[in-house]
A protein has these predicted regions:
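Glycine-/small-residue-rich active-site loops that bind phosphorylated ligands and cofactors
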Residues: 9, 128, 199
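Short, mixed charged/polar active-site loops
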Residues: 118, 142, 160-163, 216
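Amphipathic C-terminal alpha-helical segment
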Residues: 42, 203-213
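Hydrophobic, well-ordered secondary-structure elements that form the walls
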Residues: 180, 197, 214
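A short glycine-threonine-serine/GTX helix/turn-capping micro-motif
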Residues: 62-68, 162-171
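Predominantly a Rossmann-like dinucleotide-binding segment in NAD(P)-dependent oxidoreductases
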Residues: 1-3, 8-100, 214
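Glycine- and charged-residue-rich phosphate/anionic-cofactor binding loop of Rossmann-like
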Residues: 4, 160-165, 183-200
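Contiguous beta-strand/loop segments that form the cofactor/metal-binding neighborhood of enzyme cores
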Residues: 31, 69-151, 174-190, 204-208, ...
């Protein structure tokens, strides 16, 4: 058996919200909105072109670039909630000059899933404002959280205020190892299987391809169509 540890399925708010969804807290999940929008500094017009970061994690030769480094955890989480991806459309904005300043880069994607569910995802910078947060909307209620560690908020139509629900203190790595051991004993597959990791990274590559070609990328059985297994994105380290 192989498990890919690059996942936060068992971490804090990700794990707790998945438990609540499985227990029917919001009915059937149908829509998600995920923001990884960190606070950006004021960018001078000189930043309109060229690399915006020289950190190795932004270099596609070493890490895959901005998309997997920015929110592969959230992409995996969305798949754990909604199921297999059937298509994705992605575009990037920013680095436009407005007088003496330039707008920060932002990646935006719309993902469709096998049951007809949809999620919108944004990653990038907002000047002076930390715009992080995840919302999962269902047929009878919604869940939201802003930090990986929780708490999770349950929103019901008959409640004036959301219910705050704390997250377990159980170490995520212990839960991940427990899941792997269970899979080994039962002959099944762990949640963070090698195939799951391949699908996560395939989604990242499909987002790059969508931006490059300006079109929606379709999937078959959770794998993007028309992208070779050994294809590597070699575009700008920072999204342009």
């Amino acid at each position: 058996k192989i498990a890919i540890g690059h996942s936060l399925r068992f971490w804090g708010a990700f794990y707790k919200s998945r438990q609540m969804i499985a227990e029917g807290a919001i009915g059937t999940p149908v829509f998600g909105q995920i923001h990884r929008m960190g606070p950006s500094e004021v960018l001078p017009a000189s930043k309109a072109s060229g690399e915006m970061s020289d950190h190795w994690r932004s270099d596609t030769r070493y890490s895959g670039g901005s998309i997997p480094e920015g929110f592969i955890h959230e992409l995996d989480y969305s798949r754990s909630v909604f199921g297999e991806v059937v298509s994705v459309y992605c575009e990037s904005t920013g680095r436009r000059v407005y007088g003496d300043h330039v707008s920060p880069p932002v990646v935006q994607a719309v993902i469709d899933y096998e049951g007809g569910e949809t999620a919108t995802l944004r990653m990038g910078g907002t000047v002076g404002y930390n715009w992080n947060g995840t919302t999962i909307c269902g047929t009878t209620g919604s869940l939201s959280f802003t930090g990986w560690g929780g708490p999770v908020y349950l929103h019901r139509p008959d409640a004036a205020e959301p219910e705050e629900i704390g997250c377990d203190d159980t170490l995520a790595y212990a839960l991940e190892l427990r899941d792997l051991i269970k899979a080994m004993a039962s002959g099944g597959d762990p949640e963070n299987s090698g195939l799951n990791g391949k699908k996560n990274y395939g989604l990242c590559l499909a987002m790059y391809r969508s931006m490059e070609e300006g079109r929606r990328v379709d999937f078959t059985d959770g794998i993007p169509d028309g992208i070779a297994g050994d294809w590597q994105y070699t575009g700008p380290a920072e999204i342009e």
